[in-house]
């Protein structure tokens, strides 16, 4: 445990950010999973879930949870999956 007041505050702040980042990463994973499942199940309006997943990924990048390249990679892989499934139909 830190003895210096500023370090105690810093540790508390880092813990806050860690929890916030983990929550955002969970949102991204759930959105991608929901979009992929909607595509596989051939649900009506799966495009909306894909759009929502892209939006959540972009938000995570804006908030600094993900590096921009990682966000782009996640979006690209989701698009690739969707296009692959469309071509199979």
From Swiss-Prot:
One Pfam family named in its UniProt record: Ribosomal_S20p
Residue ranges, annotated region (Disordered): 68-89
Cytoplasm is among the record's keywords: no
UniProt xrefs under Gene3D superfamilies: Ribosomal protein S20
GO BP: translation
Sequence ranges of Basic and acidic residues compositional bias: 76-89
Keywords, sorted A to Z: Ribonucleoprotein, Ribosomal protein, RNA-binding, rRNA-binding
Keyword Ribosomal protein: yes
GO molecular function: rRNA binding; structural constituent of ribosome
Matching InterPro entries: Ribosomal_bS20, Ribosomal_bS20_sf
GO cellular component annotations of the record: ribonucleoprotein complex; ribosome
Family: Belongs to the bacterial ribosomal protein bS20 family.
Entry function: Binds directly to 16S ribosomal RNA.
NCBIfam families: S20
This protein's name: Small ribosomal subunit protein bS20
């Amino acid at each position: 445990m830190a003895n210096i007041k500023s370090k105690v505050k810093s540790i508390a702040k880092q813990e806050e950010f860690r929890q916030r980042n983990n929550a955002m990463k969970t949102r991204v994973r759930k959105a991608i999973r929901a979009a992929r499942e909607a595509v596989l199940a051939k649900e009506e309006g799966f495009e909306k879930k894909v759009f929502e997943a892209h939006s959540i990924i972009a938000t995570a990048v804006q908030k600094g949870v993900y590096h921009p390249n990682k966000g782009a990679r996640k979006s690209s892989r989701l698009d690739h999956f969707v296009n692959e499934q469309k071509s199979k139909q």
